Amino acid sequence: MTLRCLEPSGNGGEGTRSQWGTAGSAEEPSPQAARLAKALRELGQTGWYWGSMTVNEAKEKLKEAPEGTFLIRDSSHSDYLLTISVKTSAGPTNLRIEYQDGKFRLDSIICVKSKLKQFDSVVHLIDYYVQMCKDKRTGPEAPRNGTVHLYLTKPLYTSAPSLQHLCRLTINKCTGAIWGLPLPTRLKDYLEEYKFQV
């Protein structure tokens, strides 16, 4: 991963999302830097990106939440940009998001990494796993061998999402054919900016 903090964050750890950049020329961003910037803009539109937050703050936010509730925050580990904090049956836990070669994936042990799906954006990664959990979870399962099932079902918003964004999510859940809808072009452009269901 070729990320560096552009300015000190004051907490001895990492910077906030706006402080991260890629190594290279400041005048003309590389294609990878442009992809990362686009992915972070998308993440900023979600309403469930919390920015700089400690592990303990994330645990406190998720403590009373139902199982499957999640948020995205800046990672406290300098080798990672972001972390998913999620409420499991055993309490809140954290999972790092790896960014490498212009792709995002969940961090895992080496023997499994090559099998994990990679995504162009964090929101696409989260959307994929939310849909996968929705399809696979039919009822409460008893964990085997001390394992804990991790489900991503519902984001924890920083504040109430706008009505526009909620409508966009509903439309995305109903159809993927935005340009076939009887809507003004400007509205279709708005819907096209965020094509996810979560």
Curated annotation (Swiss-Prot):
The keyword Cytoplasm belongs to this UniProt entry's keyword annotation: yes
UniProt-listed Pfam families: SH2, SOCS_box
Modification after translation: Ubiquitinated; mediated by AREL1 and leading to its subsequent proteasomal degradation. Ubiquitination is dependent on its phosphorylation at Ser-52, by PKC. Ubiquitination is stimulated by LPS. Phosphorylation at Ser-52 by PKC facilitates its ubiquitination and proteasomal degradation.
Region Interaction with AREL1, annotated ranges: 1-75
Compartments where located: Cytoplasm
Name this protein carries in UniProt: Suppressor of cytokine signaling 2
Alphabetized PROSITE patterns for the sequence: SH2, SOCS
Cross-link (Glycyl lysine isopeptide (Lys-Gly) (interchain with G-Cter in ubiquitin)): 173
Subunit text: Substrate-recognition component of the ECS(SOCS2) complex, composed of SOCS2, CUL5, ELOB, ELOC and RNF7/RBX2. Interacts with IGF1R. Interacts with DCUN1D1.
Top-rank taxon, per record: Eukaryota
GO MF terms held by the record: cytokine receptor binding; growth hormone receptor binding; insulin-like growth factor receptor binding; JAK pathway signal transduction adaptor activity; phosphorylation-dependent protein binding; ubiquitin-like ligase-substrate adaptor activity
Pathway: Protein modification; protein ubiquitination
Region: Disordered, residue numbers: 1-29
Domain notes: The SOCS box domain mediates the interaction with the Elongin BC complex, an adapter module in different E3 ubiquitin ligase complexes.
Impact when changing residue 133 to Y: Does not affect ability to bind phosphorylated substrates
Functional note: Substrate-recognition component of a cullin-5-RING E3 ubiquitin-protein ligase complex (ECS complex, also named CRL5 complex), which mediates the ubiquitination and subsequent proteasomal degradation of target proteins, such as EPOR and GHR. Specifically recognizes and binds phosphorylated proteins via its SH2 domain, promoting their ubiquitination. The ECS(SOCS2) complex acts as a key regulator of growth hormone receptor (GHR) levels by mediating ubiquitination and degradation of GHR, following GHR phosphorylation by JAK2.
Domain SOCS box: 151-197
Residues annotated as domain SH2: 48-156
Modified residues (Phosphoserine): 30, 52
Effect the entry attributes to changing residue 106 to V: Does not affect ability to bind phosphorylated substrates
Gene Ontology CC: Cul5-RING ubiquitin ligase complex; cytoplasm; cytosol
Tissue-level expression: High expression in heart, placenta, lung, kidney and prostate. Predominantly expressed in pulmonary epithelia cells, specifically type II pneumocytes.
Induction profile: By a subset of cytokines, including EPO/erythropoietin and CSF2/GM-CSF.
Keywords annotated in UniProt: Cytoplasm, Growth regulation, Isopeptide bond, Phosphoprotein, SH2 domain, Signal transduction inhibitor, Ubl conjugation, Ubl conjugation pathway
Activity regulation, short description: Substrate-binding is prevented by the covalent inhibitor MN551 that cross-links with Cys-111. Also inhibited by a MN551 derivative, MN714, which contains a pivaloyloxymethyl that allows cell permeability.
A GO BP annotation: regulation of cell growth
